[in-house]
């Protein structure tokens, strides 16, 4: 299923590990990144901007690192 704007998504930890994005940032990921669901607020190319239900900035992740939450 293709991810689109407004979808609720989960981050796939295995796909994020050792990716370029993971190597460029702190490896101590906050728990909400994998335990919660985020909302896709924008999509540009292969990346989606995700807003989580906690008071933090949005994050950009590759679409293949995300899955639609059930």
Curated annotation (Swiss-Prot):
This protein's GO CC annotations: plasma membrane-derived thylakoid membrane
Listed GO MF terms: oxidoreductase activity, acting on NAD(P)H, quinone or similar compound as acceptor; quinone binding
Enzyme Commission number(s): 7.1.1.-
One Pfam match: NdhO
Record's bilayer topology term: Peripheral membrane protein
HAMAP family, A to Z: NDH1_NDH1O
SUBUNIT field: NDH-1 can be composed of about 15 different subunits; different subcomplexes with different compositions have been identified which probably have different functions.
Family, similarity comment: Belongs to the complex I NdhO subunit family.
Protein name: NAD(P)H-quinone oxidoreductase subunit O
